[in-house]
């Protein structure tokens, strides 16, 4: 009995020192509480061996060992439940029910042992305890299986927890990467924002400068507008002044044309008078030639001989005061003065209306024919016009009448001819005017000396068939660009 009890105690002690996860609980070992199983009195339960082994102390030790074992199991279960995360709720509930059932069974067993009599039906109580322990061993086996399943579930939960931790680590790394990327993007956004602010400030400065320039330009435009208005006023005044001067010039030109017409009429009268005098002179000359041919030849030789210069004559009387000349043209406009301060703009004047152009006057009616005049007296012998024109041309400073510097008579004074375009055709016309058959040679560049006074003719272009040099084409009377160093001359052919 004591040996069996010691064996049971040792078994319980070994199970206490070992882990319930290393060696599962075997409830069949409690069957050793059958005290008559190994003894010599195994076959008879009412003998003396059973009575010797029916000690209550062994039963008490067994019950205490069983309580201790159950306590250790409960402690291990609670440690696992506390240390392992998230166990299965169904397994925990089943385990709790089994433990509660086991506790109730042990309590009933303890009460029965304490209330059982010491002498009466001890063997029956032992066998009942044996049966109860047998049943409790089955329950413990089921409880051990549940604990093993719970342990497997805990190991699975642990593996899942490790995977979850790895996933959490990966998530943390990814979160850290995302945080770094977000910080980098935030930094870039800040840099872009700073750049945008700088650009906005720069653009604002440019806009301010542009606004100032526009303001200055508007002021300059206003000044230019004022200057243009002043210039317009001055130009309008100048235009009006020029219009007045033009009207005055028109009046002067009309007066000059009237004077020219009068002079032309007077010139025609003088020309007629001169022709008459020349006719008289020719008649006298012809008479002289007829009366005394020798005297005429002597007289011609005398006229051709150049005598010594006569004494200087007395100064003539002062002529009459001439008419006032035409007012001269206005001088060039002076340089503009310094720019004055712009004055206040005056009120805008009313725009004047353009005057209507006067109607052109009607042509006057043809006058009545005057009465027929009385028959005049018989006139003197006429002279050929070529002879008159011949008197208006002469050759000067030559070795004879056939050569010299060509001079023409115009406006009661003698003048020279420029050698521009002067050729033999021109010389032929001049020589025929003087009674010679033609020109032997023409001369330029004042070969017979420089004349004095006006240069009446320039750019003379004769065809060679004209009767007078005055019928050749030339520039206007007195219009020339030559000097007396270009006076023309001619040498005529003799008979």
UniProtKB/Swiss-Prot annotation:
Domain SRCR positions:
393-493
Annotated GO MF terms: ferritin receptor activity
Superkingdom, taxonomy of origin: Eukaryota
Report the subcellular localization. Cell membrane
Pfam families found in the cross-reference section: Collagen, SRCR
This chain is glycosylated at 103, 135, 194, 232, 255, 301, 397
Q: List the disulfide bonds.
A: 418-482, 431-492, 462-472
Q: Where is the composition biased (Basic and acidic residues)?
A: 314-323, 365-382
Which species is listed as the source? Bos taurus
Q: Where is this region: Disordered?
A: 303-382
Explain the purpose of this protein. Answer: Ferritin receptor that mediates non-transferrin-dependent delivery of iron. Mediates cellular uptake of ferritin-bound iron by stimulating ferritin endocytosis from the cell surface with consequent iron delivery within the cell. Delivery of iron to cells by ferritin is required for the development of specific cell types, suggesting the existence of cell type-specific mechanisms of iron traffic in organogenesis, which alternatively utilize transferrin or non-transferrin iron delivery pathways. Ferritin mediates iron uptake in capsule cells of the developing kidney.
- Bilayer-crossing residues are 62-82
Q: Give the UniProt record's GO annotations in the biological process aspect.
A: cellular response to heat; endocytosis; intracellular iron ion homeostasis; iron ion transmembrane transport; protein homotrimerization
Q: Which InterPro entries match?
A: Collagen, SCARA5, SRCR, SRCR-like_dom_sf
Name used for this protein in its record: Scavenger receptor class A member 5
What start-end ranges are recorded for coiled-coil regions in this protein?
A: 92-112
Task: List the ranges whose topology is Cytoplasmic.
Answer: 1-61
Q: Which positions fall inside the Collagen-like domain?
A: 306-357
Q: How does it assemble?
A: Homotrimer.
User: What is the topology of this protein in the membrane according to its UniProt annotation?
Assistant: Single-pass type II membrane protein
- Membrane side Extracellular: residue ranges: 83-495
**Keywords from the UniProt entry:** Cell membrane, Coiled coil, Disulfide bond, Glycoprotein, Ion transport, Iron, Iron transport, Membrane, Receptor, Signal-anchor, Transmembrane, Transmembrane helix, Transport
Its cellular-component GO annotations read: cell surface; plasma membrane
Give the family this protein belongs to, as stated in its UniProt record. Answer: Belongs to the SCARA5 family.
Q: Where is the composition biased (Low complexity)?
A: 324-342
